[in-house]
Swiss-Prot record:
Keyword annotations: Metal-binding, Periplasm, Plasmid, Signal
Entry protein name: Silver-binding protein SilE
Chief location of this protein within or outside the cell: periplasm
Chain's gene name: silE
Cellular component annotations (GO), alphabetically ordered: periplasmic space
Protein role: Component of the sil cation-efflux system that confers resistance to silver.
Signal peptide: 1-20
One MF term in the entry's GO annotations: metal ion binding
Similarity-based family: To E.coli PcoE.
Lineage: Bacteria, Pseudomonadati, Pseudomonadota, Gammaproteobacteria, Enterobacterales
Membrane-crossing segments per the record: none
Subcellular location(s) of the protein: Periplasm
Amino acid sequence: MKNIVLASLLGFGLISSAWATETVNIHERVNNAQAPAHQMQSAAAPVGIQGTAPRMAGMDQHEQAIIAHETMTNGSADAHQKMVESHQRMMGSQTVSPTGPSKSLAAMNEHERAAVAHEFMNNGQSGPHQAMAEAHRRMLSAG
């Protein structure tokens, strides 16, 4: 009886470790895997898909605070955005757009509207949507 239990545990251990080491390209396994965005990401180099994220330990307190404010549930709220801008000023980077009344959607041209649409979708922070928004912004500056 001990041999059967021991063999079963050994078998489950080997199987689970094999599953754990398998790398999965999630873009091949979603419901809309045929969508162009998933096809582009799936065909991308594995290094680009499985890249390493920056570690919080390697960031200073302002970078950590910026990430914390941006990733909160209500991170787009005015208070959080002001805190992000404050931390960016403390870091010395002036990448924050000036605060002022934004242009209405009706006053924007087609590329501006497309960039805004890509960024404000449910998954607007995903790579393909960000890439498309940047492409539309490049079209703005080019023409």
